[in-house]
Amino acid sequence: MTAVTECFRSLRSQGNCALIPFITAGDPDLSTTAQALRILDRAGADLIELGVPYSDPLADGPVIQSAATRALNRGVKLEDVLEIVKNAQGEVKAPIILFTYYNPIYHRGIDVFLDQIKAAGVSGLVVPDLPLEEAESLLQPAAAKGIEVILLVAPTSPPERIQAIALQSQGFIYLVSVTGVTGMRKQVATRVEELLDSIRSVTDKPVGVGFGISEPTQALQVKNWGADAVIVGSAMVKRLADNSPSDGLKSLEEFCRSLKQAIQ
């Protein structure tokens, strides 16, 4: 059984909801990212989503876009990101999910890319600009290498598309809570509860909710609606961006612990 699926199976058996923090690799620098992985792991992260900096991040809001730009300006490349993941093996227990756009995969070639991330110790993959109609070209070879490709359900997805995504998504289903890009919002759309029910009607696969969750009270609300995981990105990235590396890591740890406590 692959690491992401095993993590959710273990959590479900205990009646627990997963916490999945997201950070952008290389912001503010690679050393801080390496420390952040370890800090998030010990602060209660069940899985960790690590964003590969990309120049045209269509799904990302201003906080994560800015983080990616800073990392790219520092010269951060995929190989640097994978080196961080590789060095974390044995220390970081939480499975690491790589968040990357399709272009870097295409340019390397699917098999080469998958071999690279597998060797580094990546367990899962989120590709936000990969349409369902083209997902099979990545899903099958990834599964053969033990890497789970997590597909996204949008608030605008019709029932038949939700069913198709639920059927093919591996590890869990990533429910996008809002139409638009990532970012912090004052409240989580109540339609999320309805969308969770729609997904539940067609699959028993775990569902993680992301985009717009920035406070412990919101995380608890999403958990109470029936989510198997809460995904928090921009609010994590902002804590690293707004402080010195040492203060940012301290703030990151405190925030992660507060989220974990809220959903336990």
Swiss-Prot record:
It is an enzyme of class 4 (lyase). Keywords: Amino-acid biosynthesis, Aromatic amino acid biosynthesis, Lyase, Tryptophan biosynthesis. The keyword Amino-acid biosynthesis applies. Pathway: Amino-acid biosynthesis; L-tryptophan biosynthesis; L-tryptophan from chorismate: step 5/5. GO terms for molecular function: tryptophan synthase activity. Its EC number is 4.2.1.20. One of its GO terms (cellular component) is cytosol. The active site is at residues 49, 60. Pfam families: Trp_syntA. It catalyses: (1S,2R)-1-C-(indol-3-yl)glycerol 3-phosphate + L-serine = D-glyceraldehyde 3-phosphate + L-tryptophan + H2O. Belongs to the TrpA family. Tetramer of two alpha and two beta chains. The alpha subunit is responsible for the aldol cleavage of indoleglycerol phosphate to indole and glyceraldehyde 3-phosphate. This is Tryptophan synthase alpha chain. It comes from Microcystis aeruginosa (strain NIES-843 / IAM M-2473).
